[in-house]
Swiss-Prot record:
A GO biological process held by the record: terpenoid biosynthetic process
Leader sequence residues: none
Alphabetized Gene3D superfamilies for the sequence: UbiA prenyltransferase
Swiss-Prot/TrEMBL cofactor(s): Mg(2+)
Family matches, as Pfam families: UbiA (PF01040)
Keywords: Glycoprotein, Magnesium, Membrane, Transferase, Transmembrane, Transmembrane helix
Family statement: Belongs to the UbiA prenyltransferase family.
Region (Disordered): 1-22
Protein name: Polyprenyl transferase AOL_s00215g276
Organism encoding this protein: Arthrobotrys oligospora (strain ATCC 24927 / CBS 115.81 / DSM 1491) (Nematode-trapping fungus)
Conditions for induction: Expression is down-regulated by the cluster-specific transcription factor AOL_s00215g275. Expression is also down-regulated by the HOG1-MAPK pathway downstream transcription factor MSN2.
Pathway membership: Secondary metabolite biosynthesis; terpenoid biosynthesis
Length: 366
């Protein structure tokens, strides 16, 4: 009897030992994961990467602000000293860069669970364990505080006031990817609104802000355009995990959709340039170059090859840089040097034609 009763106890003890060993293994594995996460931790680098300071992405927010300043100067026939000119450029650059840092950090905080499931984004600081969630939240709070302070200090009250809708909308954007098919249509106006602080930084008030609306719409269309291209890199992963985007929605009609957006950009940019009295320099090196880039982007994008999406996205960053350089040159020549660019270009062309004709005549006579 004793032996029969003892057997179940032995089996029970064996089960308890097995369960105990399993629990220890799970605990050990959990500790190993925690140790591995801590070993990867590099909070300063994590803050930098969350803020995208290691990339050129912040320029995408700076560009519209500089464009707005340039167009505002043309509309208001402003005159700048070299120092005031540089002050306007610096104010727009620093305020937009800090804001971009804050909201990229916020975006990664919200997306941390999704990012770990996508091949391209699983190496981002939070899913990779480079920075803790607590540290990321602290970084966002500090960056947001700097955003408000620096915008007010450099752009003034009116400038900070027109930035406020951008800040509010930026906190909504990460959640839109879970709800609708078109988060790019939210991101477009958010970045496009950077035109308004640039405009106000030159105008000095909100009285003529409505004149900046066409450029705001052109920029918004451009942002939707390049962000849809960017999203083509993740179309397959996005479909698997349920993330929605225009790249998923228009996957089979991508080139037609992008061509439509490109046409809107050029039409609105041309309208804005005409209203703001832009010179032949802006028309030839700005509007025309932008227009020529659209078909080149479409030819370079292959939706079956995700890597081309990243390359065409980079092309758009460089295109934005080119347009910004043209705007700065336009702003400098017309508002600081007080040069009539159209007259200067006309005289230059006539002078070169005359020299060419003289050289041809001399060659024939010889």
């Amino acid at each position: 009897m004793e032996s029969i009763i003892a057997r179940p106890r032995t089996r029970s003890s064996a089960k308890e030992k097995t369960q105990t060993m399993s629990a220890k293994k799970i605990s050990a594995n959990g500790n190993n994961i925690a140790v591995q996460a801590k070993s990867k931790r590099n909070t300063p680098l994590g803050v930098i990467k969350l803020a995208r300071l290691h990339t050129l992405e912040s320029l995408l927010c700076v560009y519209p602000a500089i464009w707005g300043a340039c167009l505002s100067a043309g509309s208001h026939q402003k005159v700048f000293t070299p120092s005031s000119f540089l002050s306007v450029l610096f104010a727009n650059w620093i305020s937009m860069t800090i804001a971009h840092m804050a909201f990229c950090t916020f975006n990664d905080i919200v997306d941390r669970n999704f990012d770990g499931k996508v091949e391209r984004t699983k190496v981002r600081p939070l899913p990779a364990g480079m920075i803790s969630l607590r540290s990321a939240i602290i970084a966002f709070i500090v960056e947001m505080g700097l955003t408000v302070y620096i915008s007010y200090a450099t752009l003034g009250f009116d400038g900070a006031l027109v930035c406020a809708p951008v800040w509010i909308a930026s906190t909504i954007y990460p959640f839109m990817k879970r709800v609708v098919q078109w988060p790019q249509l939210v991101l477009g106006p958010i970045i496009g609104m950077a035109v308004f602080p640039g405009w106000v930084s030159v105008a000095g008030n909100l009285d003529t802000l409505r004149d900046a609306v066409p450029m705001f719409l052109a920029t918004s269309a451009w942002v939707v355009y390049f962000d849809t291209i960017y999203a083509t890199q993740d179309t397959n992963d996005d479909k698997k995990i349920g993330v929605k985007s225009l790249a998923v929605l228009f996957h089979n009609h991508m080139h037609q959709f992008l061509g439509f957006l490109g046409s809107i950009q050029i039409a609105l940019l041309s309208f804005t340039a005409r209203k703001a009295n832009m010179s032949a320099l802006f028309w030839s090196l700005g509007v025309c170059v932008w227009g020529l880039n659209i078909p080149f982007h479409l030819l370079s994008l292959d939706t079956k090859n995700p890597k081309t999406g990243g390359k065409v996205f980079l092309m758009n960053i460089l295109l934005g840089l080119w347009i910004t350089i043209v705007c700065v040159i336009e702003l400098w020549t017309t508002t600081v040097m007080h040069l009539d660019v159209n007259d200067f270009l006309l005289k230059t062309v006539v002078h070169n034609i005359t020299l060419t004709a003289q050289n041809i005549r001399s060659s024939v006579a010889f």
